[in-house]
Every structure is written in C-alpha cells, then in structure tokens.
A protein has these predicted regions:
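Extracytosolic and intramembrane catalytic regions of membrane-associated proteins
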Residues: 1-162
Length: 162
C-alpha cells in the first residue's frame, strides 16, 4: 500500500520537494476546502477571508508565495506577524496553519505590504481520515501500527486566487 523505499514529488505547491511514505490513490470524491473573499478593507492593503474544510478536516493551511508580501494576519482580536518558511515543502511560502478546525468556518484578515488583486496561492485541508478505497490498509495493520497524529494523512490541495 505505502511505498517506503522511493521518494516522490507529490505536492503541486512544491514540485522540487520529494516526500517519503506515499501511496497512489484514486480520487477521493471529497469536496475541496473553500475560501471566500469577504471584502477588501477600504483604504488599506487588507482583505477579509473565510476558510472552511468541507470534509471536516482537523487542519487547514493557507500558503501564499513570498511575492505576495504578506505582513501579518488577524484572527479574532489577535494580530500575528508572519515570515516566509525557509525549509521543507512549504519553503518560499507564508504559512498560516490552523489546527482544530473540523466543521468550523475561520475568518481571517490578511494584511499585505501592498495588496494586488489575483494573488495566487494554495489552500490545503489535512485529515487523518483516508479515502474509502484505502480501508483495507487499516485492516492489514496490527494494533501496533495504528495511525497517530502525524501518521496517515490525506491532503486536499486547492489552487486559489485572492
């Protein structure tokens, strides 16, 4: 089921990064995560967004390229400064990693040095639930190999423009 020997570039946002321990899959049929542009805040370089995992994944990740010049984001009353990731598959991206999402909608305000329409990026939702056609993988394991938080992961990746 899982290739434990070879590495493979499997993420559209990181074509040069090769992952270990991957499995071929067919379409899960799951609904992609959603991102709604609520509004551009007049007189600023900020935009309000709403993110949601439509399959109730535990984690949602927003990736914006370094060229977007993201300064910070607001979630609730908190402002969080950001920096570009310099390692791993998220290298070259601003990374907003939200955990514990499930069925919740998340409102964010993104603050840019200079906002330009059509900033391209990626929205990911990450879950430990695998597609139905991989149920036999669970059955083939003994109890010692049951998944953990960083074990099995199914990731939906959506190309976005904001």
């Amino acid at each position: 089921y899982v290739d434990v020997v070879n590495t493979r570039a499997i993420a559209s946002f990181a074509p040069e990064y090769e992952f270990r321990y991957w499995a071929n899959s067919i379409s899960s049929g799951w609904i992609e995560p959603s991102i709604d542009l609520k509004e551009k805040i007049k007189g600023t370089n900020s935009v309000k967004l709403r993110l949601k995992s439509n399959r109730q994944a535990s984690r949602v990740v927003l990736l914006l390229p370094e060229s977007s010049k993201l300064k910070s984001f607001n979630i609730g009353s908190q402002e969080v400064e950001v920096s570009v990731s310099s390692v791993g598959s998220y290298k070259g991206y601003y990374l907003i990693y939200l955990s514990g999402i499930y069925d919740k909608k998340v409102d964010l305000t993104l603050n840019f040095e200079e906002y330009k329409n059509e900033i391209e990026g990626f929205l990911l939702d990450i879950s430990t639930k695998l597609p139905k056609h991989l149920d036999k993988l669970y059955q083939a394991r003994t109890g010692i190999f049951s998944p953990v938080h960083r074990g099995d992961q199914a990731i939906l990746i959506k190309n976005i423009k904001i």
